[in-house]
Amino acid sequence: MTVLASNDPPTAVLNAEQIMGLLPHRYPFALVDRVLEHVPGERAVALKNVTFNEPQFQGHFPGRPLMPGVLIVEAMAQVGGLIVTQMPDLPKGLFVFAGIDGVRFRRPVVPGDQLRITCELLSLKRKRFGKVKAEATVDGQLVCSGELMFSLVD
């Protein structure tokens, strides 16, 4: 496990190219830019840089761009997917986002923000169903939290 001290600059444990080798998502749905911490089967911490030239900001909302909540949740799910999909001794296949519980949005996310997403595995059942606790922060302030479920599709 690699962990950064709080005063260290964010350096990548996994860079964008390595992330693309682990997750099936591609532009415009590749929402993980850098992984800072990755312990398969336990925990992951990653960054999503929110930029004005992302396609959703053309219509959400003109004159006041806000990152859609569903994309914040999707970014959290992708980080959670890094935990579940990289566990040893799991059957091969595609883990898909299967549900959410208790998701709350605390503040808006706008272009220029950097989401820091932390996910921790809560449970894994029958090597097919996983649940993670997820939190997204901007500048140390909580913007979104909840529990995300994953299911293995053969």
From Swiss-Prot:
It is an enzyme of class 4 (lyase). Keywords: Cytoplasm, Lipid A biosynthesis, Lipid biosynthesis, Lipid metabolism, Lyase. Pfam families: FabA (PF07977). One of its GO terms (molecular function) is (3R)-hydroxyacyl-[acyl-carrier-protein] dehydratase activity. GO terms for biological process: fatty acid biosynthetic process; lipid A biosynthetic process. The keyword Signal does not apply. InterPro entries: FabA_FabZ (IPR013114), FabZ (IPR010084), HotDog_dom_sf (IPR029069). The keyword Cytoplasm applies. It is found in: Cytoplasm. Transmembrane segments: none annotated. Its EC number is 4.2.1.59. One of its GO terms (cellular component) is membrane. The active site is at 60. It catalyses: a (3R)-hydroxyacyl-[ACP] = a (2E)-enoyl-[ACP] + H2O. PANTHER family: 3-HYDROXYACYL-[ACYL-CARRIER-PROTEIN] DEHYDRATASE. Belongs to the thioester dehydratase family. FabZ subfamily. Involved in unsaturated fatty acids biosynthesis. Catalyzes the dehydration of short chain beta-hydroxyacyl-ACPs and long chain saturated and unsaturated beta-hydroxyacyl-ACPs. This is 3-hydroxyacyl-[acyl-carrier-protein] dehydratase FabZ. It comes from Synechococcus sp. (strain CC9311).
